Amino acid sequence: MEKAITALQDAGVEPDVWKIEGLDRREDCEKMVATARRDGRERVNCIILGRGENDEKVREWLTTAAAVDGFIGFAVGRTDFWDPLTAWRNKTKTRDEAVAAIAGRYREFVDLFEGARAGRAKA
């Protein structure tokens, strides 16, 4: 991902936020931020992607990324909505049940990310 970001930046692509696939190690998250912010791009940030992974893996990635300055959020759509949406389509959940499941899981992800960010601020 570092090479891709560098190549895109060198070609003139200058997003304010880079979407980064889930990373297991803090050091890798730090490298991604350093790459995104290289050469005077201090205002550029990153978000972590869920890649449709299972809850456990996404929770690990969110916790790891949130602890690093420069990661400001996440995009975990499929991880959040896939199972409840499939259950609704298969008529094993009502619409209201699916909506509640999606909202509840998303709230858990927000709380997890924000909690890890708060820990970063105290460090």
What would you call each of these model-derived segments?
Residues 4-28:
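Catalytic beta/alpha-barrel core
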Residues 21-121:
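Catalytic-face loop-and-helix region of soluble metabolic enzyme cores
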Residues 1-8, 58-64:
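Short, acidic/polar
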